[in-house]
């Protein structure tokens, strides 16, 4: 079996292994190894936990609901505690062509996913006995045309202390400022600790084996740039990490919500699960803030709730852009995504951008492709001599190996010359695979005709079938030294195997492979013409 076909088999096995491995990781992430401490019975970390002396009571009556809106999202805030209970992403449809905004945060009987925040500690206003009931005039607040930011303050007064919970919306940004301004006129110093947490129903990661997706927690700390912490991890071992910088998040396919506390103070990152109600929380607890009598203090934090936009997230917090997880192929995926985005900005079609990127990749690899076919042609010419050596030294494998290496050297043939282009294309393919799984820019991105979502599988399986046909043609047009009938049958079956395997892959990825095959066929014919002139190839079968 020639090297090219052998590596096609290896490529299929390798891709299958990577997909299965990632699916297993998403279903069963590795056990947490970073140093953690248990949350004790005396802790007042805010969550619905029996061991929590200052836990937030979930049974409290909801307050008034107000709406905040800028040009990219619409938020609903509960004035009881000031939690974000809904976020509608105005630039993203819930389903393809549905015209209904995608709702990321939501609170229903079937599913809870909300962003809670408050003040706990010695003089906290969010305790088991009750939460702050904020006051505000009006129900709807919208960023006006020409405005770059909008501040919406909620007011609460208690024991001579005025608390303002201020939400800051910015134009074109999914980054919501959540600040506290505290005016202490009580006559004595007070101490509070800020917290923010994401409360989510415990669910399993979704998707299929070909396109697995992760739903669960993640965090960043001063010791760990980025780490997933699944709901099963939370159920097995509650997280508790002290860090000066960092953030906590809940991830799902293409979207993320993340609390980013003040990065200049010490924070505790934690998780708490409520198995009875099937919910889990991942959050942070800030350092104690002391406000002397007659003084004011401002406590800052921010909440990202929106799509995984790498460039924007990188400016919000260190390592937040790592939630776009390209796996081990990130060093290839990032420049490929940049190139895709650049070309899409010119052609205004992601499908055309994929075709252009494929052309660029094949052009870069052309010298290696030419060397591959030249090496294969020389190897075919050497087949009679190699067969003669097998007959002469069949019992002396060491001598036969030495003679063959000598023959390769004399004829200036690299026996592995046919492998390199395929080996280089494999990580490129894997990088594109993760790009299509992770890049929200490709979600619901149309091509032409029946392909209206390049991030989803072809609904009619036309592209996988065309890809299989192109692979079959490429195989038939490539001379092979395979003489064993069994091996030949296996190779003839490979296009069908690949076609079946690609039925569930993103259509954009199948488009890449199809165009790559077509370009390879064209390059092959061009190379063969040159080889014919050198007497290294004949079109006669």
From Swiss-Prot:
One of its GO terms (cellular component) is plasma membrane. This is Membrane protein insertase YidC. It holds the Pfam family 60KD_IMP. It is a multi-pass membrane protein. Gene3D superfamilies: 2.70.98.90. GO terms for biological process: protein insertion into membrane; protein transport. It comes from Haemophilus influenzae (strain ATCC 51907 / DSM 11121 / KW20 / Rd). Interacts with the Sec translocase complex via SecD. Specifically interacts with transmembrane segments of nascent integral membrane proteins during membrane integration. Residues 34-56 are annotated as: Disordered. It is found in: Cell inner membrane. The chain crosses the membrane at residues 6-26, 337-357, 416-436, 454-474, 495-515. Keywords: Cell inner membrane, Cell membrane, Chaperone, Membrane, Protein transport, Transmembrane, Transmembrane helix, Transport. Belongs to the OXA1/ALB3/YidC family. Type 1 subfamily. One of its GO terms (molecular function) is membrane insertase activity. CDD domains: 5TM_YidC_Alb3, EcYidC-like_peri. Required for the insertion and/or proper folding and/or complex formation of integral membrane proteins into the membrane. Involved in integration of membrane proteins that insert both dependently and independently of the Sec translocase complex, as well as at least some lipoproteins. Aids folding of multispanning membrane proteins.
């Amino acid at each position: 079996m020639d090297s090219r076909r052998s590596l096609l088999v290896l490529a299929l096995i390798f891709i299958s292994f990577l997909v299965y491995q990632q699916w297993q990781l998403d279903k069963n992430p590795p056990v947490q190894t970073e140093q953690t401490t248990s949350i004790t019975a005396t802790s007042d970390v805010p969550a619905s936990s029996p061991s929590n002396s200052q836990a937030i009571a979930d049974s409290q009556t909801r307050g008034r609901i107000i709406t905040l809106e800028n040009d990219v999202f619409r938020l609903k805030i509960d004035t009881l505690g000031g939690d974000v209970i809904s976020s509608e992403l105005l630039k993203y449809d819930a389903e393809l062509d549905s015209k209904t905004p995608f709702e990321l945060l939501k609170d229903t009987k079937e599913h809870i996913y909300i962003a809670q925040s408050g003040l706990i500690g010695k003089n906290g206003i969010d305790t088991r006995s009750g939460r702050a009931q904020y006051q505000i005039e009006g129900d709807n607040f919208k960023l006006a045309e020409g405005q770059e930011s909008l501040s919406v303050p909620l007011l609460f007064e208690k024991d001579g202390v005025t608390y303002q919970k201020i939400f800051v919306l910015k134009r074109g940004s999914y980054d919501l400022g959540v600040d506290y301004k505290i005016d202490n006129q009580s006559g004595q110093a007070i101490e509070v600790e800020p917290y923010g947490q994401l409360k989510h129903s415990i669910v399993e990661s979704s998707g299929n084996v070909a396109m697995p997706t992760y739903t669960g927690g993640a965090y960043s700390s001063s010791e760990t740039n980025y780490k997933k912490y699944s709901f099963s991890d939370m159920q097995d071992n509650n997280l508790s990490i002290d860090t000066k910088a960092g953030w906590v998040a809940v991830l799902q396919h293409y979207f993320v919500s993340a609390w980013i506390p003040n990065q200049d103070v010490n924070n505790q990152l934690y998780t708490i699960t409520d198995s009875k109600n099937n919910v889990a929380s991942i959050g942070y607890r800030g350092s104690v803030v002391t406000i002397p009598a007659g003084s004011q203090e401002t406590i800052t934090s921010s909440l990202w709730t929106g799509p995984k936009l790498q460039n924007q997230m990188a400016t919000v917090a260190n390592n937040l852009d790592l939630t776009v997880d390209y796996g081990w192929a990130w060093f290839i995926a990032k420049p490929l995504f940049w190139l895709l985005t650049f070309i899409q900005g010119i052609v205004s079609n992601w499908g055309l951008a994929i075709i252009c990127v494929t052309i660029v990749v094949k052009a870069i690899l052309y010298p290696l492709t030419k060397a591959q076919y030249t090496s294969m042609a020389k190897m075919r010419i050497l087949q009679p001599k190699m067969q003669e050596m097998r007959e002469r030294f069949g019992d002396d494998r060491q001598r036969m190996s030495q003679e063959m290496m000598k023959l390769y050297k004399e004829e200036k043939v690299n026996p592995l010359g046919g492998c390199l282009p395929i080996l280089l294309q494999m990580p490129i393919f894997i990088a594109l695979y993760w790009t299509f799984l992770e890049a929200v820019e490709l979600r619901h991105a149309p091509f032409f005709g029946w392909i209206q979502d390049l991030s989803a599988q072809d609904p009619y399986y036309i592209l996988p079938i065309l890809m299989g046909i192109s692979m079959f043609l490429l195989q038939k047009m490539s001379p092979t030294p395979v003489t064993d009938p069994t091996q030949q049958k296996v190779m003839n079956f490979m296009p069908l195997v690949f076609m079946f395997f690609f039925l569930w892959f993103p259509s954009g990825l199948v488009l890449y492979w199809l165009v790559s095959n077509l370009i390879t066929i064209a390059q092959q014919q061009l190379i063969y013409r040159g080889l014919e002139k050198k007497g290294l190839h004949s079109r006669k079968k």
